[in-house]
């Protein structure tokens, strides 16, 4: 009979002790995100959270997302500090468009070989994103899967649950009307979409993103600028300003052409005034370097616009003043119009706002 060496889990590539070390590293950052509704801490089989008592007819709103191939850039450039903010932003910004207050967030971190420093850095970013959004990081899953990923590679996914009063649910399909004004909220940059095309352009440019400067800032800084989280600004707008928000669109994958129609009723379209804003320099660089036509830019990227709010024209000035007062860059970008066809929902024009 042949003697066999006694194997253990670590021999197979899974270091349980590293997982324990990671939990200890992140406990403080996680606890700082907790809301009064959170019951208990890390370590249970399931996270517990009560509904805020202020809601009479609470509607739960959930969302899940990732950060796409922006993660590939972060890994290649060894910049792990802010990708977690992106992960939270992609989820909570989808909730706020329906008027929902994010309650809690969970993350999924999968890797070929767990590097405690890298994972702790990423999760610290997730905790920072949760603090920006006012939601609690209540748990997650760290999966070490040798053979599934290259050793230092990792993947991320996030899940968020929020709540909105039934009477305050924002439903564009029911509320948007021809004549509504569209307000834009500036993005912080590319956010977390279009990065497969971004990486192609970067390869074509042959630029070193760490050393090549664009308007006084490294290309790497532009490309990895964290996604802006709009939750607190929009929630405060809803709760304090008595404005009748008809719809909010989050400009993510698919840009203008895919996201704005998601909140439009039938027989409506939107007119966008291109001259109402100037693209941030990173979008100009991408278009020029990649020889990308303007329609493709609008279909792939946010081009400097993170959110679009539809509301009655007589409430536009008040809303703009408030958004500016809470630190948002906002402006009139267009209006809703009637349409007899469903084929052309987004129309770009040089000038429409004074017509």
UniProtKB/Swiss-Prot annotation:
Q: What is its main location?
A: cytoplasm
Q: Which GO BP annotation is one of this protein's?
A: adenine biosynthetic process
Query: Per the record, GO CC terms?
Result: cytosol
Q: In which pathway does it act?
A: Purine metabolism; IMP biosynthesis via de novo pathway; 5-amino-1-(5-phospho-D-ribosyl)imidazole from N(2)-formyl-N(1)-(5-phospho-D-ribosyl)glycinamide: step 2/2
Q: Which domain of life is it from?
A: Bacteria
Catalyzed reaction equations: 2-formamido-N(1)-(5-O-phospho-beta-D-ribosyl)acetamidine + ATP = 5-amino-1-(5-phospho-beta-D-ribosyl)imidazole + ADP + phosphate + H(+)
What family is reported?
Answer: Belongs to the AIR synthase family.
- The identity of this protein, by name, is Phosphoribosylformylglycinamidine cyclo-ligase
- State the organism of origin: Hamiltonella defensa subsp. Acyrthosiphon pisum (strain 5AT)
Q: Supply the source organism's classification.
A: Bacteria, Pseudomonadati, Pseudomonadota, Gammaproteobacteria, Enterobacterales
